[in-house]
Design a protein with these regions (language model features):
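Beta-lactam-recognizing serine transpeptidase/beta-lactamase-like catalytic domain environment
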Residues: 1-38, 48-173
């Protein structure tokens, strides 16, 4: 777990369960999961995808769309429950954690604007925290289906410290 000051972004405490015996002094391959591993962030990324749409002036929370599934070329994006909730608005889609809502917004934004917003939040780059072995994660999407899945945190990787940094930017605004 990690505790951060929402106003400053400072890490106040962080702890993890080690995969080694801490009583042995020969710890040669310890990596801190806060900074040294990148993961697919999943639905937490929807927060930032919706933010990107708002910041770029294309978000209309009352606009309706058909939830459930979205066809993108030969690929299909499904909401987690596979059937959706019928025709709903984007505000409701956000509250239901709709993959199709995030995908539609990302497709409206396009690759460049979504990537620029993710870059602005610090995804895909080191945060500069003074802990060893920080990795960058990978924010890479080119095709429409990759853009769509990135909007709900699949096909990209981030580190926990990047997610914390991005979330504290919201709390601090």
């Amino acid at each position: 777990f990690t505790i951060a000051d929402a106003k400053t972004g400072a890490i106040l405490a962080s702890a993890s369960n080690p995969s080694f015996n801490p009583n042995k002094l020969d710890i040669t391959n310890y990596l801190n999961p806060l900074v040294s591993y990148a993961y697919e962030p999943g639905s937490t990324m929807k927060i930032f995808s919706f933010m990107a749409a708002m910041e770029n002036g294309i978000y209309d929370g009352s606009k309706e769309y058909m939830s459930g599934k979205l066809q993108i070329g030969s690929d299909t994006v499904n909401d987690f429950n596979k059937v959706g909730w019928g025709k709903i608005n984007f505000d409701t889609g956000f509250s239901y954690s709709s993959n199709t809502a995030a995908s539609l917004l990302a497709l409206d934004l396009g690759n460049e604007k979504l990537r620029a917003f993710y870059d602005l939040l610090g995804f895909g780059q080191k945060t500069g925290i003074t802990l060893p072995d920080e990795v960058t994660g990978k924010i890479d999407f080119q095709y429409p289906i990759e853009l769509a899945t990135a909007s709900f945190g699949q096909g990209i990787t981030t580190t926990p410290i990047q997610n914390i940094q991005a979330l504290t930017s919201i709390a601090n605004d």
